[in-house]
A protein has these predicted regions:
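12-transmembrane solute porter fold
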Residues: 43, 67-242, 247-279
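Glutamate identity and glutamate-enriched acidic tracts
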Residues: 13, 62, 99, 168, ...
Length: 299
């Protein structure tokens, strides 16, 4: 005689798709994308304003919805989960914003062939892989250092590219090497922090929301990537990539793009500090619980 396990009520409740939130999320990205196509500043502002309103509606709908898109507390920076999602999003935005236009900048400003420019742009991905491998075995204080190193290296790389990428060169290795180091630094930072940020999402999610937390990681990453790409196009367009275009327009676009999006990892330093603080508090509480358990056993 077999006894079937009891059905998990939480899992059943979250089985339906959060259609309203998905529509609002998609519409917010499309609003920024539509605004970025126009070279007119007013249309860019309208696109951003529309995306902001739609994001606000998304948060309101999510807080009231029966079927959630993200775990509880995901939209509040004061919670451990909110700080984690914010840090992940800011790192993803930094990588995406640079990755899209780096091949173009290298071709126009540094006279590289499309093939070479593509390989050099892939240095971000190589740095990400290297960072993930390097930080995979760390524990204790090493985890905190890896999480903080992510946005710090990202900010350093973005600031360096703000200065280096905009200056036209003959494409020699003397001028390309510092740019390559900046690209690697951005990817390396994300790679160092990312595995531990993912682990923390599972650790801080409430007991009935582990499955939702697992699914939400991809949702947050893709949303941040799409939004970062749309915003990058908007900044580059406004900065002169299309008008006046050429060397002058591309140089201006490179300076503005990396300068504006350097703010993402800089803000990420502060959200990463919150992640580390929450991690320390949880560690202390677990240690206190173990000590109480040992005291009860000995008594």
């Amino acid at each position: 005689m077999a006894v079937l396990p009891k059905r998990n009520a939480d899992r059943t409740e979250h089985s339906s798709l959060p259609i309203a939130q998905l529509i609002l999320l998609t519409a917010a990205v499309l609003a920024v994308s539509a605004g970025s196509v126009s070279p007119t500043l007013s249309w860019n502002i309208i696109g951003l304003a529309t995306a902001t309103i739609l994001t606000g509606l998304l948060i309101t709908t999510e807080n009231r919805a029966r079927h959630r898109l993200l775990p509880a507390g995901a939209f509040r920076i004061t919670t451990a989960l909110g700080a984690l999602y914010a840090t992940m999003s800011l790192l993803a935005v930094a990588v995406t914003s640079g990755e899209i236009f780096v091949p173009l900048f290298l071709q126009v400003l540094h006279h590289q062939s499309p093939l070479v420019a593509g390989y050099l742009a892939a240095l971000m991905a190589a740095g990400w892989t290297l960072g993930s491998i390097a930080s995979s075995g760390v524990s204790g204080k090493g985890i905190k250092c890896a999480i903080l190193a992510g946005p710090i290296l990202g900010a350093a790389g973005m600031v360096a590219l703000t200065v280096l990428m905009r200056t036209e060169s003959d494409g020699g290795w003397m001028s390309l090497t510092p740019i390559c180091i900046g690209l690697i630094a951005i990817g390396l930072g994300v790679g160092l922090a990312w595995p531990h940020l993912l682990t923390r999402v599972f650790q801080v999610a409430s007991a009935g929301e582990q499955d939702l937390a697992a699914a939400s990681i991809t949702t947050v990453q893709l949303f941040a990537t799409a939004l970062g790409a749309a915003l990058a196009g908007m900044v580059a367009n406004v900065a002169g990539l299309s008008d006046p275009g050429g060397i002058a327009g591309t140089s201006s676009a490179a300076a503005w793009l990396f300068g504006v999006f350097a703010l993402a990892p800089i803000i990420g330093v502060f959200t990463a500090l919150r992640v580390v603080r929450f991690h320390s508090k949880n560690g202390e509480s677990h240690k206190a619980s173990r000590n109480r358990s040992r005291s009860d056993i000995t008594s």
